[in-house]
Amino acid sequence: MCGSSMASEKQVKFVIVGGGIAGVTCAEQIASQFPSDEVCLLTASPLVKKVTNFRQVSKTLEEFDIEEQPSRVLEEKYPNLKVLQSAVRLLKAREHLLETEDGQRFFYRKLCLCSGGRPKLLSKDNPHVLGIRDTDSAQEFQKRLSTAKRIVVIGNGGIALELVYEVEGCEVIWAVKDKAIGNTFFDAGAAQFLIPSLEADRREASSVCKRARYTTDSSAAGHSGSSSELGSALGPDWHEGIELRGAKQSVRGVHIEYECEVEQIYTQQELLQSEHGTKTAELGVWPAYVQLTNGKIYGCDFIVSATGVVPNTDPFLPGNNFDVAADLGLLVDDHMRTSEADVFAAGDVCSAGWEPSSIWQQMRLWTQARQMGWYAARCMAADVLDEPIELDFCFELFSHITKFFNYKVVLLGKFNAQGLGQDHELLVRCTKGQEYVKVVLSGGRMVGAVLIGETDLEETFENLILNQMDLTRYGEELLNPNIDIEDYFD
């Protein structure tokens, strides 16, 4: 049995590596499609991440919750699915052999690598730097924050955006390398719409979070590897259910430093001995000091590194012949196949190597992890059954629903005019504190949109992007709030 902790050798038809969204979705799909075949899921974490409450909002838009669950929940639902908690030691792709850290050897027929990404840490071994990646590191952050008066947050992606908004009772210095916050998701206009939310009291959440939460039992048998390196990534509402409050009584205070990165991190002693030692008195006494590339130095209790992830390919590359993309992901074709026979990949670890639709791009978001895991399972099944399969429709249009600063955010197509150069125009409608709507037009046709707030425009705009209707004659009337745009395009 593949869940056994004893060293063994086993033939398994399907092996999936990774207990995150892509891996679990892939394992569930393949286990349900081949109920009489054993499926083995290898995960470095004692908890797995499962999609729940899935809802198809429109043709391509989808909403779902993510629950962390003990692996036995999966095994109870799928009797042919066995979950083994162990990291991968090595892969010999030509021999179809996978070996785990605890000595088990699996000869697979089809393998899907869904090992996700590992955080890009500013400084790997600095005790004053915390990378927030998995559940354990989020709990460590909560613990350290409870006694903190000031933290420095480095990064401008989704986790950084959520973190600076959620933290209370602690001063936050937020260093972003771009000219505006949320550069991955927004342009400067959308960023300016959101900035007042950082300066005001938090907006009340519109709905209660009903996700089940489990904690990691540190004594769980068979746990191996560093959780900071190997644990599956946080869910989109990772901060729900944990209080992110510092030691100060004041509610909040966020100061943003734009267009800068970290140049140096000092301890008290190191700062005293540096060329900046004379500034110690004005900077105050802190456990750590951060020097930014704009020359400014801030003292803080600790530094949060939220600068993104790199594909976690390390265990698989040695001795194999994988094609690797420029972003270091495993290159996959339109059937999620890597360059090694019978090895598939999905989620953050892979890079889409096919010619993409003109209105789709890979962004390593939760939505895409689920879609890729599900589609990879279907491709593996088609391979085994020798059946044809076409690229799924979900890869036709980029679409993502999320929430930032407690505003609903919908991103569609080339929402930031990615790759369009000067060949585009923007239409923008903004109602302060209520909604922000941006449309990207190219050649008179809608190719992207950003919707912040309860706009109810997502389905109409999705249709306009997909059918590529010429909108030239509508001009700015397209965003006229006094006109029901749906009436135009029924």
UniProtKB/Swiss-Prot annotation:
GO cellular component, one term: sarcomere
Cofactor(s) annotated in UniProt: FAD
Keyword Lyase applies: no
Cofactor notes: Binds 1 FAD per subunit.
Chief location of this protein within or outside the cell: nucleus
Pfam family, any one: Pyr_redox_2
Keyword Flavoprotein belongs to the record: yes
Free-text disruption phenotype from the record: Morpholino-injected embryos show severe disruption of the musculature with fragmentation of the muscle fibers, altered sarcomeric structure, loss of fiber integrity and accumulation of actin at the myosepta. Disintegration of the myofibrils with mitochondrial infiltration of the resulting space, loss of Z-disk structures, and electron dense, nemaline-like bodies are observed by electron microscopy.
Subcellular location(s) of the protein: Nucleus; Cytoplasm; Cytoplasm, Myofibril, Sarcomere
Family annotation (InterPro entries): FAD-bd_OxRdtase (IPR050260), FAD/NAD-bd_sf (IPR036188), FAD/NAD-binding_dom (IPR023753), FAD/NAD-linked_Rdtase_dimer_sf (IPR016156), Rubredoxin_C (IPR041575)
Superkingdom to which the source organism belongs: Eukaryota
Function: Probable FAD-dependent oxidoreductase; involved in the cellular oxidative stress response. Required for normal sarcomere structure and muscle fiber integrity.
Protein name: Pyridine nucleotide-disulfide oxidoreductase domain-containing protein 1
Species per Swiss-Prot/TrEMBL record: Danio rerio
